[in-house]
Amino acid sequence: MTILTHTLGFPRVGLRRELKKAQESYWAGNSTREALLAVGRELRARHWEQQKQAGIDLLPVGDFAWYDHVLTTSLLLGNVPARHQNNDGSVDIDTLFRIGRGRAPTGEPAAAAEMTKWFNTNYHYIVPEFSKGQQFRLTWTQLLEEVDEALALGHKIKPVLLGPVTYLWLGKVKGEPFDRLTLLKDILPVYQHVLAELAKRGIEWVQIDEPALVLELPQAWLDAFKPAYDALAGQVKLLLTTYFEGVTPNLDTIIALPVQGLHVDLIHGKDDVAELHQRLPVDWLLSAGLINGRNVWRADLTEKYAQINALVGKRALWVASSCSLLHSPIDLSVETRLDTEVKSWFAFALQKCGELALLRDALNSGETAALEEWSAPIQARRHSRRVHNAAVEKRLAAITAQDSQRENPYEVRAEAQRARFKLPAWPTTTIGSFPQTTEIRGLRLDFKKGNLDANNYRTGIAEHIKQAIIEQERLGLDVLVHGEAERNDMVEYFGEHLDGFVFTQNGWVQSYGSRCVKPPVVIGDISRPAPITVEWAKYAQSLTDKPVKGMLTGPVTILCWSFPREDVTRETIAKQIALALRDEVADLEAAGIGIIQIDEPALREGLPLRRSDWDAYLEWGVEAFRINAAVAKDETQIHTHMCYCEFNDIMDSIAALDADVITIETSRSDMELLESFEAFDYPNEIGPGVYDIHSPNVPSVEWIEALLKKAAQRIPAQRLWVNPDCGLKTRGWPETRAALANMVKAAHNLRQAK
């Protein structure tokens, strides 16, 4: 039984973000659909060949997506919301883009579908919409076309499909309430059709992803797997694929299914390999997810070998990435600026493919010398002076309960803040960033490349900040921001100014659609050598009599949106960041900044996938935020911002943050998120987002007023703020001005209606 390698998926965007550039060029009308499709073909061919050359035996096909793989599955099934449909009922790539972003080069603009986090990652998917009596049919043959592409290139492949139960689990009911699980019988014929088409093409194995099987699912959902897979059995071999957690709690359900193999995540799960071997049917293949698909660290392959070697010869075995490599950058070899020692600790997607090949060869031969050689740098890291900072460890150990308490409760603070700021009813603000124009990006790039000296760079940034203040005053906003012209990314910027982080040149990963992020890497203990945001916040405040918010990214979000260390707990990392940013809050306050926003959009996404593990995470996550914020005086107003969240199940923790104002993303969900705050009787102030910044569509005054009136039915108007859903970094100035003008007008109308 020869052991094979495979990956669950590969990054789509390209080493130089070629897909992003092609998408945005097409959306802007600067290139043709044919040019976009050609870029996709070139990337797929390149990525298959790269994986093959790195030692992958079975290449994934179907992991490529033009926007998101869940959205691709929706189109595959003909699940297109009525507002996004073509007049003739056809489905094309512009249909896909209208669902994802609200508009495309053809067709009528319409509200984009909701977007939320993919399990507990920093990737976002487009939420499928379901309605009672809905019909499904095969309307989008992208998977079959890509299978034909790969076969024509002579590759040995493994098509990838998102499984039917997980697909339904990830969606939402729109319109008349009903149980969306009842649609399972209606989507299965489409899956049967697709599997039949794959069988016709000679496909032996299909990877069918059911990550919902790692969750604590209701019994009705667990019971749905058996009839679903009974219907799908028999056409090809099915590799039931799970990731992000272990499967042991749901193993009884899994082993009853008529599949031929199981993939398990042995990085993030607690599954015992010996127990899995004992309980799985003897003829099943086990795919062992031994290489972390969600991080950038080189694996200690000697440990991986020891973990799985006992099964060699006892059952069919593949070695794989824990999850899709979508969550990892592509290629470490192009990183030329990393310190040699630090670089030796890392492995990106292609290097992870190489790790799988090394592991396969050792397991097949019993020869481990190559594993020992590969693992030596990561073993040596444990003793590196770059990793440990005694002063940070001492400060962390000295934290007391008082460090996470504000001076007085919210009611007392609110009085002091009202007296200080004298804001009108329905106060208007934005979330932080303004459009990152070509000029701003060029300025930063020239400075980074050394083509611009520090003085000229600072002069340029100051001018953009000044213009942002002028724009906001002209629009009539009440609480201003400096616009974040100096920041490339809300996490990267702070990581660049904190010790304990390193950065890559090309370590891009997809966040959603064409949006890519370049997460910093936490390599050691974290501290703040100097103030980070104070200078620009102070400058912006000097330009206006209106309050300007200081803007910080919170500790949990910096943790979640970075590649973390693997040698300490996430709690330790979060609290180290909190202590560093606590000093930043104190410095902003001393500089005269009276409103400080600490963004925590990732608080919920960091939740463990199993609810039974939530309490411990929320306890330290909330404590980290409070350590960060609690140094502020009563008259300093602390804001926080959260997005893509379902709040109802963590309202206790949201309230425990004790932020004076929370701004949240609500427009895509039509303010339904406020139900959680109403039911909880949330005591502090709230800014429900009144328009979707992920879409270029400009909301009308009437639309915004209607949303605010709906909000006021749930939250007392005197505690409501008026703001967009999120930062405006990815928008252009024309639609930003138009949308904010309408937002301010709506707030003025409501004030006059009092």
UniProtKB/Swiss-Prot annotation:
Gene3D superfamilies hit by this protein: 3.20.20.210
**GO biological process per UniProt:** methionine biosynthetic process; methylation
UniProt similarity note = Belongs to the vitamin-B12 independent methionine synthase family.
Which residues are noted in the entry as Zn(2+)-binding? 641, 643, 665, 726
Return the InterPro entries for the record.
Answer: Cbl-indep_Met_Synth_N, Cobalamin-indep_Met_synthase, Met_Synth_C/arc, UROD/MetE-like_sf
Q: Where is the active site?
A: 694
Question: Which residues does L-homocysteine bind?
Answer: 431-433, 484, 599
CDD domains (UniProt xref) = CIMS_C_terminal_like (cd03311), CIMS_N_terminal_like (cd03312)
Enzymatic class? transferase
Among HAMAP family, the record links this protein to: Meth_synth (MF_00172)
Pathway annotation from the record: Amino-acid biosynthesis; L-methionine biosynthesis via de novo pathway; L-methionine from L-homocysteine (MetE route): step 1/1
Where along the sequence do coiled-coil regions lie? Answer: none
Manner of cofactor binding, per the entry note: Binds 1 zinc ion per subunit.
Q: Please list the reactions this protein catalyses.
A: 5-methyltetrahydropteroyltri-L-glutamate + L-homocysteine = tetrahydropteroyltri-L-glutamate + L-methionine
Q: Which gene encodes it?
A: metE
Residues bound to 5-methyltetrahydropteroyltri-L-glutamate are 17-20, 117, 515-516, 561, 605
Q: What is its EC number?
A: 2.1.1.14
The protein's UniProt keywords, in alphabetical order, are: Amino-acid biosynthesis, Metal-binding, Methionine biosynthesis, Methyltransferase, Repeat, Transferase, Zinc
What this protein needs as a cofactor is:
Zn(2+)
Protein's UniProt name: 5-methyltetrahydropteroyltriglutamate--homocysteine methyltransferase
Pfam families attached to this UniProt entry: Meth_synt_1 (PF08267), Meth_synt_2 (PF01717)
**Any keyword Zinc?**
yes
Which organism does this sequence originate in? Answer: Salmonella agona (strain SL483)
Q: Which residues of this UniProt protein bind L-methionine?
A: 431-433, 484, 599
